[in-house]
């Protein structure tokens, strides 16, 4: 039996001359639970150690004489080595094992992601068929899907690698050494009290300012807080009155607050503040019927409708009326059979003013020219009237013109149609006719020929003194005549003694 025949089976197999085994490795060492240690810690990127399952180990005896022996760093966990090694070597071994385990996990995750990408391709084919049948919401997704899938795969791989690196670094920072981060106050979620104070001040300044319609910044006064408190009180009063109505008790909370609401609505320049703080919604609750289908108090309805029928509240936009429900509340009062005639008239005018922007009608008639008035009237003219107007503008032929009796008027200025005949004229039919609405369009405004206002007849200033003297004289003579008419009794009756 030769020297080589007594060797291990690994030595008898054809060995690779590139990767020798360290002299420390002996055949009596216990096997690692994770498999072959040399294969696990072998450098994947090294050109000298290609990964091959059939590459056997080579002992130092089979290596050629004089050739340099290359060793690989292999760590074998044994009881003797663990006793001899210090804490620093244990820490290094833990870091190396975590890093190598993370590399293997990353490799398996990449393979898993590749399989998922194949499944996603199949799913993409299904989605493409579904698009061909039913269509898609946007066409841009069809062109961007392959790029998005590749980006998603790259993000998944990067995220997994970053998590693995974080897990590797976490045991080192959690040790007793002071090499870790110095932030002991909660990490990234820590926030200084000074930053909190600055954020509160910034939010307070943001509440105190608002953007105007022209893009400028308007400073809001202290009316916001007052109006907000008033709105809360108004809603609470409306709720109390509804509860009292359900319990068959007198509801007087809104009546008590009516003077306060009237005072705030009469203030100038506060309409925008009222709208922003929800005053209109509270006002609609005040005008809404009670649970027993009865209207609110008459004083509330009269006061609120008169205050709303102010030019300041005519310019409420459509969104405000819709969100607050104020338009529905006023319309309900206009259509309610128990509402008074005066309140219905005010509600009708108010609805007409609010509806003008919906029909694109201007509220200021002084700036409208004659041509604009004619165009607006023509656009609002019914189709039948337009056809008649076009037929009149066209000059009909004498043969096709309808034959109507024509006469000369009294002054002989021109012909007159039979419809314009007066009683006593030839062809006039003296009978009653059904009145019809006039289809005339009055576009010419009559001119005002009076220069100044007429206040009545004025008397001369010189006669005032004479009239005053005459009135004084008449009063004195009237008193003297009254004294003379006293009857004197000869017998001494009615005498003051």
UniProtKB/Swiss-Prot annotation:
Feature: compositional bias, Basic and acidic residues: 123-134, 144-160, 181-191, 370-382, 401-411
A Gene Ontology BP annotation from the UniProt entry: poly(A)+ mRNA export from nucleus
Protein location: Nucleus
PROSITE patterns: TFIIS_N (PS51319)
Taxonomy, superkingdom: Eukaryota
Main localisation: nucleus
Annotated GO CC locations: nucleus
UniProt keyword list: Nucleus
UniProt-annotated stretches for the region Disordered: 1-191, 369-433
Keyword Manganese part of the UniProt annotation: no
Residues annotated as domain TFIIS N-terminal: 281-361
One Pfam family named in its UniProt record: Med26
Gene3D superfamilies recorded: Conserved domain common to transcription factors TFIIS, elongin A, CRSP70
Family: Belongs to the IWS1 family.
Name listed for the protein in its UniProt record: IWS1-like protein
Species in which this protein is naturally found: Caenorhabditis briggsae
